[in-house]
């Protein structure tokens, strides 16, 4: 996830290795303007094999997260690797790591405040958004609790049909979520952002 011109966030899952992360960071530092890499040590769960299944930035200072992995006693290990330093530094949480880099980020909880809805909607790619621009994202229509949380943060929910037919216009500076049906895609295990690659 590119967060800023000098900062990216990556997930370290069971599909990667310490050597792969080491090689990736060295290549990134040597060949790009990136100076900070935030590493999220992913859980060994089928529903969280990619970072965008538990974290997606949806606006400059706003991200959708699966709360158990980022807030409270079950939160994941977060590491910060700064260019020029030989070792990574463990951070208290992802928000402290980002704040230390001048990137304050406010979370939107996937599934809202109820754990059962968080689990259900995370499984259905509730954290997985495609950012078209800061504040304009695409999402499945099925994750009602997450979409309600987005509305609380000032996002207007617009159906893809309404958007494509011109019934719903979105201003250049407006926060909006364009939703689309994707029941079969969810059953196949893919989220909207996953399918953009």
Residue positions per predicted region:
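The feature marks the mature, well-folded catalytic cores of soluble enzymes
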Residues: 1-197
């Amino acid at each position: 996830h590119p967060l800023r011109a000098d900062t990216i966030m990556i997930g370290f899952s069971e599909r990667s290795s310490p050597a792969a992360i080491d090689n990736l960071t060295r290549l990134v530092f040597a060949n790009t303007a990136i100076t900070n890499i935030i590493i999220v040590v992913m859980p060994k769960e089928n529903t969280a094999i990619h970072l965008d299944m538990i974290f997606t930035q949806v606006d400059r200072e706003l991200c959708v997260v699966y709360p158990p992995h980022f807030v409270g006693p079950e939160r994941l290990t977060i590491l910060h690797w700064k260019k020029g330093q030989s070792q990574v530094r463990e951070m208290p949480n992802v928000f402290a790591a980002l704040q230390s880099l001048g990137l304050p980020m406010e979370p939107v909880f996937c599934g809202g405040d109820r754990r059962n809805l968080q689990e259900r909607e995370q499984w259905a790619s509730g954290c997985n958004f495609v950012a078209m621009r800061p504040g304009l994202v695409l999402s499945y229509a099925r994750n009602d609790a997450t979409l309600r949380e987005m509305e609380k943060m000032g996002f207007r929910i617009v159906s893809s049909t309404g958007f494509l037919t011109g019934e719903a216009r979105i201003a250049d500076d407006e926060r909006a979520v364009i939703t689309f049906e994707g029941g079969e895609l969810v059953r196949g295990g893919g989220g909207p952002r996953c399918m953009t690659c």
